Amino acid sequence: MRLEVEQEDDGRWLAEAPALPGVMAYGDTREEAIIRVETLALRVLAERLEQGERAPELDRLFAAA
């Protein structure tokens, strides 16, 4: 999943997952922002699956043979 990461004017880092609207996180470092947004993205995808929704973002990770 593609992430967008940028440094804000106040020095904090913002990372977001454009494929999942609203999934964004701040961090004091670039790495911290990435870890936080990855964690949030996984939680959102897990909740979708628990609700019985498809999560096309996972299609590249899992393939039924």
Predicted regions and their residues:
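Acidic-enriched, low-complexity/disordered segments with a strong bias for Aspartate over Glutamate
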Residues: 9-10, 28, 59
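Short, charged, surface-exposed hinge/linker loops at domain edges
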Residues: 1-2, 31-65
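A short, exposed loop/beta-hairpin motif centered on an aromatic-Gly-Thr core
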Residues: 21-32
